[in-house]
Amino acid sequence: MRRSEPLDLLLLHAPSVYDFRKMSIFYGPISDMIPSSTVFEMYPLGFLTIASYLQKQGMRVRIVNLAVRMMKDWSFSVPRFLASQHPRAIGIDLHWLPHAHGALEVAKIAKEIHPGVPVIMGGLSSTYFHQELIGYPQVDYVLRGDSTEAPLVQLLLALRNGGALDKIPNLTWKQSGLPRINPLTYLPPSLDYADLRSDLMVEMVLRYRDLGSVVPFDGWMWNPITAVFTVKGCAYECATCGSSHTTCSHLTQRTQPVFRSPESLVANIVAISRLIRGPIFLVGDLLQAGMDYAESVLQRLRETTVENQVVFEFFDLPPVAFLRRIDSSVRHWSMEISPESHDYEVRMAQEGESVYDNEQLEQIICEALRLRCTRLDVFFMIGLPQQTYQSVQDTVAYCEHLFAISDRRLSCFISPMGPFLDPGSRVFEEPEKFGYRVFARSLEDHRRLLVQPSWERILSYETEWMTRAELVDATYDAAESLNQSKLKYGRISTRRGQAVANRIRAARDIRTRLAANQNQEVDAGSALEGEIEKFSASTICDKRELFWSRHLVNFKVREILGILYRFYSKGLSEKSV
């Protein structure tokens, strides 16, 4: 490709709140259980599958993580940057609902600077709110569903060549200012059509001389977590999940999960391992597709030389025999499981299909730790149906019990569900049935909540069993107790544990002072600006607990040199903008 060739698609990832550099919002722990910060700067994996698929079609794509650029350089101007770009189309993700503010603001700026350039939005939240979204003047198109790569190609070609739009599947668009909704009919029966290509990220860095725009989240270079999709859709019915079977049936029209073939899945794992030494997450439970499928994946992994940590996610308890098969097939492996609560009744109130008691959970934990499992993370949630304040504290006591019967490879985490209920989830659609009171129904409702002064007021729900204030109390009390248990059983160092304890105390103090000045929100927030920023990260745990041990060198130099050679031999380098 030559420098003069136009950019077919500029993919932009916005911060959660566009004005985060100017506003003092006390986010608390809402991002403590994910790799990114309260800016929610991690772009969806779909950016990489889109870029990979479009490149195969001869199209040119650039990913720009505006959130990271804005975080790393406070003088970075989004309008000035966008004015320097000349794409044929602009794509903006609204996948996770916490981007409701930033995504719309970036779209507005893009449309003001490039009024003739179409703005396309996509993602699960875009899919749910597509009719409301298309009503915003800055949004021209919304692509619905969980696999929009092929419809996106059709749309870009139609826009370039003047083709008809009414035949493009999954598209919501405007005609003479009025919304048009094409049927959501594109549902690929396999996920083999697009890879998560880490080498494509390197090529973008080389082409634009711009590392900051491509990194998935701030700190990724030090902790290069990677992932591959194993499935889209789900067989389970968890009431709080925005990707449950019922939700997918209505939202993306998937009435059953679709899986990536074992051959394609393992080939993608191997390709990632050639470049990156970090852990590789298998997104989704392999056992959803059946034991034969899962065994086939393990057999192919056994035949590879992958040295990365391979992280297995389980929605239900895996059979002991399957854990042993993992142990004999994968050199380095870890596992994650999310019982959500220690309380069987609370767990059952989710109305999912995984039914196990604590004794069975403990048997699997002990078996995994008897094997070569490097790390075992157990996740619990606050804000569930039928969950009381006392139940949350009892869950933390159960975590201490798990520490007592295990070793340092096991860790437990607990966090509030939020800041929003998942749109399309059963609790979102039937809040009264599950005991919820919701404070946001529309996209605009959620956008407005995001700029409230504290996470207590950002929360989009409360339950029959806990108000928003009680959810916050339960969170800080649980975090404090869990931190003490981690110190007691050596899960974290004294230094880190003390730092977490100090942050929890400071967060409580900030909450009290904000509440005392709730009628003077702006002044109170401005007065606490430095403290709010400092104590809105690693509040309820040290975020470093989420990451695996670092390597001295996280990337494989030989593979990078190979990419460099192939890249420059084709004359693809361009001057950075």
Predicted features, each with a name:
Residues 7-39:
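Short glycine-rich His-centered loop
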Residues 53-57, 62-190, 424:
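Glycine-rich beta-alpha loop elements in corrinoid/cobalamin-binding modules
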Residues 1-7, 11, 60, 82-85, ...:
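Radical SAM enzyme core and accessory elements
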Residues 3-12, 120, 261-375, 382, ...:
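Conserved SAM/AdoMet-binding glycine-rich loop
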Residues 218-261:
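Canonical Radical SAM [4Fe-4S] cluster-binding loop centered on the CxxxCxxC motif
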Residues 130-137, 386-401:
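Catalytic cores of alpha/beta
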Residues 2-5, 21-24, 174-230:
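N-terminal [4Fe-4S]-dependent radical SAM core
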Residues 19-20, 129-130, 236, 248-249, ...:
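Flexible glycine/acidic-rich beta-alpha junction loops that bind and position SAM and/or redox cofactors
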